[in-house]
Curated annotation (Swiss-Prot):
Biological role: Plays a key role in the innate immune response as part of an interferon-dependent multiprotein complex, recognizing and sequestering viral RNAs that lack host-specific 2'-O-methylation at their 5' cap. By distinguishing these RNAs from host mRNAs, inhibits their translation by competing with the translation initiation factor eIF4E. Could also prevent viral replication through its interaction with DNA replication origin-binding protein E1 of several viruses. Causes the translocation of E1 from the nucleus to the cytoplasm and can also inhibit its helicase activity in vitro.
UniProt-listed Pfam families: TPR_12, TPR_2, TPR_8
Expression induction or repression: By type I interferons, dsRNAs and viruses.
SUPFAM superfamilies, A to Z: TPR-like (SSF48452)
Organism: Homo sapiens
InterPro entries given in the database record: TPR-like_helical_dom_sf, TPR_2, TPR_rpt
Signal peptide: none
Binding residue positions for mRNA: W147
Documented effect of changing Q290E: Decreased capped RNA-binding. Loss of capped RNA-binding and decreased translation inhibition of viral RNAs lacking 2'-O-methylation of the 5' cap
Name recorded for this polypeptide: Antiviral innate immune response effector IFIT1
Entries under PANTHER family matching the protein: INTERFERON-INDUCED PROTEIN WITH TETRATRICOPEPTIDE REPEATS, INTERFERON-INDUCED PROTEIN WITH TETRATRICOPEPTIDE REPEATS 1
Subcellular location: Cytoplasm
Stretches forming TPR repeats: 52-85, 95-128, 141-174, 183-216, 218-249, 251-284, 305-339, 340-373, 378-412, 437-470
Length: 478
């Protein structure tokens, strides 16, 4: 039976390892089922040279769920794959898997087996003249850490990018780190698409990654989407066609090719690709959300074609699109309750359906969330403000949420729309009641935000005079 001293000694050694247990992967409990599904999908459908790490991550997820025996099986698969895929680097790459084994056995109370794996790590470190007993600084492990962080969601993307960047500083032509850096950069760019004055930085890394990984269809479709963002759709479509012609990672390629075609306006083609992908990965949150967006696009097409007055068959088609979009958005948020964008799309679609109770439920969930990106919270407050103004007919609540969106000072299109909506609402109130203290003050505030200082001062002064007149009348009494 182990002593407390043994336990502490082993624990001190474990803390020095570089593996999933020491990388501080930020994973919310609500995100665990979706993460596990994405990991399993990647194992089955993504053709990659870097699959050992995904088995290690699956083992870590299984451990977090309390399934330690299943976790050990995943680590054994990782160990077997290591021998097949990385013969010349097996020893270095194995350090992550062995580190995870050591932590697993420690958590299971099997200290002797934990020590066995610690000894394996120490032997390799000695063999490679490493200055640390249990910690190896090398590009291979930097990449493993980067992939793990990248898979665990938006909170980890900056750290993932830094891991791949560290490798590229030493080896700029490294295909693996080039791919990882480009994917990280693309996702971080995606967070900032609605931000004013944001300069995208993922286009060049994606071009470099495609050059170094010419058979990787997944990176090609990301490059295509970024080219589309930059107004270079024709060039982007060439990469889409190349990726679709290659059988590699087709389920993943379909997802992103569909997004490209939806944004191009070819919604039917997008839906065809998404439904093919959904047959292979029916639990994919991303697919359900993308399908919902396609039905939303078709709904908008019907509205525009009928000038917002659909009747007969058009009305039936519109209602069908709304129901279909709701179904897929619901599927997405059920599988990933922290998916803020899908929750917002769902709330807005319930407004289209006239179901204000369900819209309110989803907005209330959103208001309790803490999105990774500030602009997402701006979107939530802006759309909830519009819901309050136009559906609930509450100017008071609408103003509160427009102001909350504006208070988030990140310059964005949504912030501009919030300022404009607040201005329209306040002007409407002033037309009804010219001597309204709050409205005069708010209009002064809006003009200040717009940089119209003369108008701002005029309305602030009118508000102050009105407040002074009111105070004098109260003092004088009836």
């Amino acid at each position: 039976m182990s002593t407390n001293g043994d336990d502490h000694q082993v624990k001190d050694s474990l803390e020095q390892l570089r593996c999933h247990f020491t990388w501080e992967l930020s994973i919310d409990d609500d995100e665990m089922p979706d993460l596990e599904n994405r990991v399993l999908d990647q194992i089955e459908f993504l053709d990659t040279k870097y699959s050992v790490g995904i088995h290690n991550l699956l083992a870590y997820v299984k451990h977090l769920k309390g399934q330690n025996e299943e976790a050990l099986k995943s680590l054994k698969e990782a160990e077997n794959l290591m021998q097949e895929e990385h013969d010349n680097q097996a020893n270095v790459r194995s350090l992550v898997t062995w580190g995870n084994f050591a932590w697993m056995y420690y958590h299971m109370g099997r200290l002797a087996e934990a020590q066995t794996y610690l000894d394996k790590v120490e032997n390799i470190c000695k063999k490679l003249s490493n200055p640390f007993r249990y910690r190896m600084e090398c590009p291979e492990i930097d990449c493993e850490e980067g992939w793990a962080l990248l898979k665990c969601g938006g909170k980890n993307y900056e750290r993932a990018k830094a891991c791949f960047e560290k490798v590229l500083e030493v080896d700029p032509e490294n295909p693996e780190s080039s791919a990882g850096y480009a994917i990280s950069a693309y996702r971080l760019d995606g967070f900032k698409l609605a931000t004013k004055n944001h300069k995208p930085f993922s286009l060049l890394p994606l071009r470099q990654a495609v050059r170094l990984n010419p058979d990787n269809g997944y990176i090609k479709v990301l490059l295509a989407l970024k080219l589309q963002d930059e107004g270079q759709e024709a060039e982007g479509e060439k990469y889409i066609e190349e990726a679709l012609a290659n059988m590699s990672s087709q389920t993943y390629v379909f997802r992103y090719a569909a997004k490209f075609y939806r944004r191009k306006g070819s919604v039917d083609k997008a839906l065809e690709l998404l439904k093919k992908a959904l047959q292979e990965t029916p639990t994919s949150v991303l697919l359900h959300h993308q399908i919902g967006l396609c039905y939303k696009a078709q709904m908008i097409q019907i509205k525009e074609a009928t000038k917002g007055q659909p009747r007969g068959q058009n009305r039936e088609k519109l209602d069908k699109m709304i129901r279909s979009a709701i179904f897929h958005f619901e599927s997405a948020v059920e599988k990933k309750p922290t998916f803020e964008v899908a929750h917002l799309d769902l709330a807005r679609m319930y407004i289209e359906a006239g179901n204000h109770r369900k819209a309110e439920e989803n907005f209330q969930k959103l208001l309790c969330m803490k999105p990774v990106v500030e602009e997402t919270m701006q979107d939530i407050h802006f759309h909830y403000g519009r819901f309050q103004e136009f559906q609930k007919k509450s100017d008071v609540n609408a103003i509160i949420h427009y102001l909350k969106a504006i208070k988030i000072e990140q310059a964005s299109l949504t912030r501009d729309k919030s300022i404009n909506s607040l201005k329209k609402l306040v002007l409407r109130k002033l037309r009804r009641k010219a001597l309204d203290l709050e409205s005069l003050s708010l209009l002064g505030f809006v003009y200040k935000l717009e940089g119209n200082m003369n108008e701002a001062l005029e309305y602030y002064e009118r508000a102050l005079r009105l407040a002074a007149d009111f105070e004098n009348s109260v003092r004088q009494g009836p």
